[in-house]
Amino acid sequence: MVTLDTQSIIRTVNVNFYYGRFQALTDITMDFQKNRVTALIGPSGCGKSTLLRLLNRMNDLIDGCRVEGQVLFEDQNIYAPEMDPVEVRRRIGMVFQKPNPFPKTIFDNIAYGPRLHGFRKRSDLEALVESSLQQAVLWEEVKDILPRSAMTLSGGQQQRLCIARALAMKPDVLLMDEPTSALDPISTAKIEELIDELKENYTIIIVTHNMQQAARVSGMTGFFYLGKLIEYNATEKIFTNPEQKQTEDYITGRFG
């Protein structure tokens, strides 16, 4: 296992996670580097999406779940009693598997979160909406139709809108749970290009079943199996010279 604590922004320390009596994650210790893309791979049910969701306390919304160990964000345990989960989720944003725009206008999809956090001045909101859509490489496609319902956008545009919506909250980290699995190849390529651009300013952690995608977009890769972190290393090493036989068997298609 490789740890890179000199530049880590998130660190998990001996994390165990339970759904009721079922243990979904066992003794997970990882460092996530700042301004890098980290991919989490493994077969269905291996715990990678569970780990992603506990990195910003999304699992708090599930009855009966329990976390042991520490999840440190900038050296603060996000599960400490004094930590505000709403603020945690603002700074560690999430993009889901299927595009989930609000049934509102394109403009209001981006402005909704900032309004809840105190943005009131129209000119400030307009500037924030434009900059967020620019970062998500969507501005040129929607700048003339901002009053239109977000539901009229294509699937790929909706997913970029959801990324822009997350960016409008000024996060430090962006979590992506299979963000292209519901998209066509052209839309997938656009999202991958966007991920490459966003890593200049954000830390990105992506769950993907697509091994080729993990190889293309990430600098680090963690392989999970049955709730355990089997191997964590530079992506190139994981895919060309893995240290664990289970990793090699998975990436060569022997199981999964």
Swiss-Prot record:
Keyword tags: ATP-binding, Cell inner membrane, Cell membrane, Membrane, Nucleotide-binding, Phosphate transport, Translocase, Transport
Primary localisation category: membrane
Keyword Manganese in annotation: no
Keyword match Cell membrane: yes
Membrane topology: Peripheral membrane protein
Annotated positions binding ATP: G42, P43, S44, G45, C46, G47, K48, S49
Catalytic activity from the UniProt record: phosphate(out) + ATP + H2O = ADP + 2 phosphate(in) + H(+)
ABC transporter domain location: 10-251
EC id: 7.3.2.1
Localization per Swiss-Prot or TrEMBL: Cell inner membrane
Family: Belongs to the ABC transporter superfamily. Phosphate importer (TC 3.A.1.7) family.
Name of this protein: Phosphate import ATP-binding protein PstB
Species name: Syntrophus aciditrophicus (strain SB)
Chain's gene name: pstB
